């Protein structure tokens, strides 16, 4: 990671436990993970702040052309090989389910940069970094739903869109509300459903991605699996202060 975002990440991590937001994040972590606040891992706030602040700095301040330089390995080469191994673009239309992970924008940037020439993308989100990214890859923008290109539609499961339909699922033993999508629509237009999850931090040498493919009728299961993956890598999620969106819709 470049000097400025690395410095900013260290400063934010140093201050992480001394803010009012830290109390809210601790309470939300305790609620979601079903543990007393006294059992929240001591380093959780510091690690979470370090992960998020550095990559958020990159996505907000730097142009997308510089994003990949903030990873210690060749992210584009990794993603190109990984998508090939996964047959990631084998469907004519793919609904890609993500969440607001640390560095999610950098991963999507690598997808945009390395996808086959006939693949186009569209984002259903209000996330400013992703709109900034799409503007930088204008040639990848889907011009028409019925254009003769393979299409990847990116939907963030932990974001609430205006007037979006919701469905109820379980986050552990708690009820949660996620964005619903018509399985009839997905089936009619030949969509497959895919998840996109980090195995560990983009800072780590052992970084990797995992993805599962689902049939259109299993959309809700894919969405629930995406949410519950949060339990594996809680320090990488950027929305611990926004848990009410999931619990109350």
How would you name each of these model-derived features?
Residues 1-98:
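Membrane-anchoring hydrophobic helices of lipid-metabolizing enzymes
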């Amino acid at each position: 990671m470049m000097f400025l975002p690395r410095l900013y990440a260290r400063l934010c991590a140093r201050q992480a436990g001394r803010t009012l937001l830290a109390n809210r994040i601790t309470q939300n972590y305790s609620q979601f993970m079903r543990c007393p606040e006294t059992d929240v891992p001591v380093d959780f706030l510091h690690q979470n702040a370090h992960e998020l602040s550095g990559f958020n700095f990159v996505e907000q301040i730097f142009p997308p052309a510089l994003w990949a330089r903030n990873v210690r390995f060749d992210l584009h080469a990794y993603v190109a090989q990984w998508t090939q191994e996964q047959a990631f673009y084998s469907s004519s239309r793919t609904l890609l389910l993500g969440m607001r992970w640390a560095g999610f924008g950098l991963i999507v940037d690598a997808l945009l940069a390395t996808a086959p020439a006939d693949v186009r993308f569209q984002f259903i989100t209000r996330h400013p970094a992703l709109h900034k990214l799409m503007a930088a890859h204008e040639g990848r923008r889907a011009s028409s739903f019925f254009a003769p290109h393979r299409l990847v539609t990116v939907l963030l499961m932990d974001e609430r869109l205006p007037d979006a339909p919701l469905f109820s699922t379980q986050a552990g033993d708690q009820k949660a509300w996620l964005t619903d999508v018509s399985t009839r629509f997905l089936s009619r237009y030949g969509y497959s459903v895919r998840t996109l999850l980090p195995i560990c931090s983009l800072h780590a040498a052992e970084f990797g991605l995992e993805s599962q493919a689902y049939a259109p009728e299993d959309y809700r299961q894919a969405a629930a699996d995406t949410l519950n993956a949060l339990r594996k890598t809680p320090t990488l999620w950027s929305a611990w202060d926004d848990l009410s969106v999931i619990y109350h819709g």
